[in-house]
């Protein structure tokens, strides 16, 4: 991996309050291209809250976020995804009753036009998800296999596959 001085993500003086509870206070963080960064701390220290702020799930009460040097206001996780930032949630956020391929594309499914209607393109979902799983060397029976049939490690791998399937610049876990 090649490391550079290019800062992909910078958080400046991030604070998050839930009523009278201070979950984060003046957190500063920067992540450079090619860098792997771990955030550690005690239970209740605010690690998950910080990750949810960075991924657009929570709006910071104070502070600023910069992506590739540009100040950004994240209104939703879709905003962070559009900037190339993806998150693998602690609970993995997988739908056990859906196949692997549909979990990878959940919310971003390729469609095909059928007159006035759009329908999910299941063939494309399967082809693209199998190609991505192969690229990541994730071995499963089929992209049609339901997530609930997978082991815990395989589920984690599928969550990572989803986070990396859409040209992410930064993956938060």
In which residue ranges do the predicted regions lie?
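Glycine-rich phosphate-binding loops of nucleotide-dependent enzymes
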Residues: 1-173
């Amino acid at each position: 991996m090649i490391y550079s001085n290019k800062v992909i993500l910078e958080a400046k003086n991030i604070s998050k309050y839930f009523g009278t509870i201070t979950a984060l206070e003046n957190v500063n963080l920067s992540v450079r291209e090619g860098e792997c960064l771990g955030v550690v701390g005690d239970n209740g220290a605010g690690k998950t809250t910080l990750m949810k702020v960075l991924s657009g799930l929570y709006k910071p009460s104070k502070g600023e976020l910069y992506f590739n040097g540009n100040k950004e206001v994240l209104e939703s996780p879709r905003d962070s995804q559009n900037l190339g930032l993806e998150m693998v949630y602690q609970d993995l956020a997988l739908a056990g009753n859906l196949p692997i391929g549909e979990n990878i594309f959940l919310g971003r499914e390729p469609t095909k036009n059928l007159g006035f209607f759009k329908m999910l393109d299941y063939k494309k979902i399967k082809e693209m998800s199998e190609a991505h799983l192969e690229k990541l060397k994730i071995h499963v029976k089929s992209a049609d296999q339901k997530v609930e049939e997978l082991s815990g490690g395989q589920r984690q791998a599928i969550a990572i596959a989803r986070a990396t399937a859409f040209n992410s610049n930064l993956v938060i876990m």
